[in-house]
């Protein structure tokens, strides 16, 4: 990614302190279990280690570490029974979910030969899970539980841990990067309009405003011909250009991409929403004509770029790109009633990582509904499972996620330069459109290859945002 971020995950374990002097063998046992648990957390995140906690004072010290690090999530390993006083001081001042990891060491106790120490150390992780959740509820804290076993490996547990870490990456990305708005939203698309202060307060995301006048001049100081040539080749490697492409043909575009990449890094941008509604002449016309493929090159590198000034779908694209590796702007395009299929797509910049074959670039005289004309890019999303995410708001400004899973199928698509795909939903096209529309999304959505609702639900819990699941 052009701007890298790394989630910070708080980790600690708890056990009842009264057990340890009674059964000294539990100390090395629990230390070994805690060390083994930390190794299951992927190195894509930074661990903030709160240690093994058996007293209130140790819990308070763990909490100090978590607060100082501004953790995005907390994993709590339940080693054996422990009172909730071992837990609450560590998370009392945090506003992130606490994931209780109830992972038993062995699959089953030897009922005939197990003594008390062995039971406490190897088979009693479940002892305090309900108590912990009860007190997290009373404290107003968000929570989740993962239950499983160490012996023999447990892929379900590992998948849940990795999923939560992906979700935590979204929070960190929103906190550490900014969203750029160039120009303003498309006039009259009131579903896209947003209160930037509310956005920052609720989603941690800060907006940086930019005028098009600055963008037109952004490439004026780019003189590194080697960098421009390399980027031109990157563009040719990414797209099949109608009528053939040469480095000379995409030179100006490459120069703008190099400039945009520097701008993204300098301004620490994770997302961009843009719309131009002026006279597409001179420098303005040059940039306007090539902005779609230029921004596609940024999307390829992890910076979500949304047309029509839609900051909400830029956020949705960034979420999906972060958790799945793909994030394509889309909207309801048409319905094929003969095949009971929804045609979903959009004109504008796209994500090369979602494309099953080399995307195409072609010139059109007019950008329909917009100023000017120039290059369109068409991507060809993979067949198979697909996830859609829209971000919307209620009358009080609260955000909401609207999600659905479907299956992209082979078949005829439109070929005038816009990305579009044929998606089948289990509820049928007619019912899907009814349900999706009734959920009140913006008219844009983001698409990602694969099934990701379970991860999106974790992202929503981290942000404390409700989710409407339309179909899966």
Locate each region found by the language model.
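Cap/lid and interdomain-hinge subdomains that line or gate substrate/regulatory clefts
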Residues: 2, 7-9, 107-232, 236-239
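Short beta-strand elements in bilobed, periplasmic/extracellular small-molecule ligand-binding domains
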Residues: 31-55, 142-148, 205-211
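Short, well-structured alpha-helical segments in soluble
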Residues: 59-71, 88-90, 257-266
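Periplasmic-binding protein-like
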Residues: 71-80, 99-101, 269-274
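Short, acidic/small-residue loops that bind anionic groups at enzyme active sites
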Residues: 89-115, 120-128, 293-308
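Long, internal scaffold/assembly segments composed of regular secondary structure
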Residues: 231-323
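Extended hydrophobic packing segments that form well-structured cores
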Residues: 370-472
């Amino acid at each position: 990614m052009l701007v890298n971020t790394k989630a910070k995950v708080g980790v600690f374990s708890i056990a009842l302190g009264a057990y340890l002097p009674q059964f000294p063998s539990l100390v090395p046992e629990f230390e070994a279990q805690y060390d083994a648990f930390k190794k299951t957390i992927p190195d894509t995140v930074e661990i903030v280690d709160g240690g093994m906690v058996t007293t209130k004072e140790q819990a308070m010290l763990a909490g100090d570490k978590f607060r100082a690090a501004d953790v995005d999530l907390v994993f709590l390993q339940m080693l054996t029974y422990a009172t909730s006083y071992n837990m609450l001081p560590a998370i009392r001042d945090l506003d992130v979910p606490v994931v209780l990891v109830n992972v038993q060491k062995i699959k089953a106790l030897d009922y005939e030969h197990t003594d008390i120490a062995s039971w406490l150390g190897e088979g009693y992780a479940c002892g305090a899970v309900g108590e912990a959740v009860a007190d997290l509820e009373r404290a107003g804290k968000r929570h989740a539980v993962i239950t499983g076993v160490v012996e023999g490996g447990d892929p379900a547990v590992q998948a849940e841990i990795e999923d939560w870490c992906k979700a935590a990456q979204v929070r960190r990305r929103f906190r550490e990067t900014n969203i750029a708005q160039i120009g303003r939203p498309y006039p009259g698309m009131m579903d896209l309009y947003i209160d930037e202060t509310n956005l920052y307060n609720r989603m941690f995301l800060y907006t940086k405003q930019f005028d098009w006048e600055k963008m037109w001049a952004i490439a004026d100081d780019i003189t590194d011909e080697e960098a421009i040539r390399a980027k031109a080749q990157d563009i040719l490697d990414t797209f099949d250009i109608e009528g053939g492409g040469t480095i000379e043909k995409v030179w100006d575009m490459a120069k703008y991409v190099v400039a945009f990449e520097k701008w993204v890094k300098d301004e620490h941008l994770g997302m961009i929403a843009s719309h131009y509604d002026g006279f597409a002449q001179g420098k303005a016309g040059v940039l306007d004509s090539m902005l779609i493929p230029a921004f596609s090159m940024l999307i390829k590198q992890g910076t979500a770029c949304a047309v029509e000034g839609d900051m909400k779908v830029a956020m949705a694209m960034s979420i999906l790109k972060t958790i799945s590796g793909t994030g394509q702007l889309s909207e309801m395009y048409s319905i094929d009633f003969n095949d009971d299929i929804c045609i979903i797509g959009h004109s504008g910049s796209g994500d090369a990582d979602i494309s099953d074959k080399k995307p195409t670039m072609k010139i059109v005289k007019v950008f329909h509904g917009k100023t000017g004309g120039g290059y369109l890019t068409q991507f060809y999303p993979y067949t198979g499972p697909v996830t859609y995410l829209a971000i919307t708001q209620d009358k009080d400004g609260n955000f909401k996620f609207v999600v659905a899973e479907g299956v992209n199928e082979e078949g005829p698509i439109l070929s005038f330069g816009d990305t579009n795909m044929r998606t089948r939903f289990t509820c049928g096209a007619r019912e899907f459109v009814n349900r999706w529309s009734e959920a009140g999304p913006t008219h844009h959505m983001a698409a990602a290859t694969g099934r990701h609702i379970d991860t999106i639900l974790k992202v929503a819990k981290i942000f404390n945002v409700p989710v409407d699941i339309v179909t899966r």
